[in-house]
Swiss-Prot record:
This is Argininosuccinate synthase. One of its GO terms (biological process) is argininosuccinate metabolic process. It comes from Arthrobacter sp. (strain FB24). PANTHER family: ARGININOSUCCINATE SYNTHASE. L-citrulline binds at residues 87, 123, 127, 175, 259, 271. GO terms for molecular function: argininosuccinate synthase activity; ATP binding.
Amino acid sequence: MTERIVLAYSGGLDTSVAIGWIGEATGAEVIAVAVDVGQGGESLETIRQRALGCGAVEAYVADASDEFANEYCMPTLKANALYQGHYPLVSAISRPVIVKHLVKAAREFGATTVAHGCTGKGNDQVRFEVGIQTLGPDLKCIAPVRDLALTRDKAIAFAEEKGLPIETTKKNPYSIDQNVWGRAVETGYLEDIWNAPTKDIYDYTATPEFPPAPDEVIISFEAGVPVAIDGVRVTPLQAIKELNRRAGAQGVGRIDVVEDRLVGIKSREIYEAPGAMALITAHKHLEDITVEREQARFKATVGQRWSELVYDGQWFSPLKRSLDAFIEDTQKYVSGDIRMTLHGGQAVVNGRRSETSLYDFDLATYDTGDTFDQSMARGFIELWGMSAKVASGRDIRVAGK
């Protein structure tokens, strides 16, 4: 029986060429797998037909946009996950759901190997292969760009020689990855970290220097999940899309950062994540009034570690699963409404309300009639500062000898 290889297929030049390239290099039949995570663009049927036209014996296509929003974006939101304080894990969280469907397709079509189009310098090779090893430990992995020396020049030449139904061009100097949670742009002139991004690289966001009138929005949450916008019930996917549209029109969510890659190098990245950044901002402000202080402090540490694990391709790891359980427990009372104004590249919260709020007006007010007993403060301060006071006394005593 002829060996079968499942290929993570985007519909672009590199993975279209990889179908024939893998076939010639290995003699195997190739099954193309395309997964919709809300990236927009061409229809799944168009992509399926292109894969078949490029030589795939089967084409598996899956609309995973709701699955991605519910099972991957929402945990990211609950964690307030920003890798190194900036990056909302746009590409990192899409890889596990793609891996899930790659392994599913491999089982369905009797494949023994999974292929992806990642280079040997990026994070995605790790995310794909660690995920595949975890969900399908018997499956082998190959990476044509990395393992079979498939360069872009070779890809163009191969496509033209074979007459493949795919556009061949060297025009676009950027590497772009996008889904409903955001958009990532790298390489080209951006590799000189002194170069400012030009307007042409942006697609999800309008120029914030010339915004339309301010847009006020009310986002309602239940247990950490957005459930309504301006009183209209929405699914997580609908919430992200609506805020992509509204926050994007105001230039919200542009990120220019140099980050530490898993493989040990620093990389300059441009991200657009208008919906994600608006939602994370709103969610964090709701947590500020609903999550107890010590729990909130520790959750910030957990969220940072969660972000690192996901960035590093450990979505399916035991530690990440344990952190998920802690984060989920913190969301029990994260329900209520956040009002924010979107304008000029900013998402500014100016109102919050919750039936499970820990904010007590009578305790917090400085007006007459407050219920805070200030007479307790002196004793509290004495006890709170006791340890430092005793240590200071020792320092003075030792220094005087």
